[in-house]
Amino acid sequence: MKTYQAKESEVAREWYLIDAEGQVLGRMASEIARRLRGKHKPEYTPHVDTGDFIVVVNAEKMVLTGKKLRDKIYYHHSGYPGGLKEKTAGKMMQEKPTDVLWLAVKGMLPKNSLGRRMLRKLKVYAGNDHRHEAQCPKVLPL
């Protein structure tokens, strides 16, 4: 008997809705990454994108534990000499809370083209409104 390997065309994809209000960032991000990879499915195959679509609302109301709002620093580089920029998690949560969750999930996915394709299935919104009612996402309790 041959080992089953899923094909991209045979994978049934679901849409899930997650309410981030009161959820801890890291715990929520790890569950989102698991669902984006498809590891919760019996037909999971490491080299095939078997994951589902995830819509996250209320990203501005998620929780960072401890002193992370003050102490956690996000870095990026402009590409120019002396262009290393940094922001605290508190400032990021004020300006763009969607990026905080997006970066946390990005760090938990594979660092290759498959990981980038998985990340495109993540839709994050700061408020309660989203544009995916037509897909009828199922509410995913965490």
Swiss-Prot record:
Any single biological process term in GO: negative regulation of translation
InterPro entries (alphabetical): Ribosomal_uL13, Ribosomal_uL13_bac-type, Ribosomal_uL13_CS, Ribosomal_uL13_sf
GO function terms (MF aspect): mRNA binding; structural constituent of ribosome
SUPFAM superfamilies: Ribosomal protein L13
Keyword presence, rRNA processing: no
One CC-aspect GO term: cytosolic large ribosomal subunit
Pfam families noted in UniProt: Ribosomal_L13
Record's function text: This protein is one of the early assembly proteins of the 50S ribosomal subunit, although it is not seen to bind rRNA by itself. It is important during the early stages of 50S assembly.
Family: Belongs to the universal ribosomal protein uL13 family.
SUBUNIT field: Part of the 50S ribosomal subunit.
Name recorded for this polypeptide: Large ribosomal subunit protein uL13
Organism encoding this protein: Syntrophus aciditrophicus (strain SB)
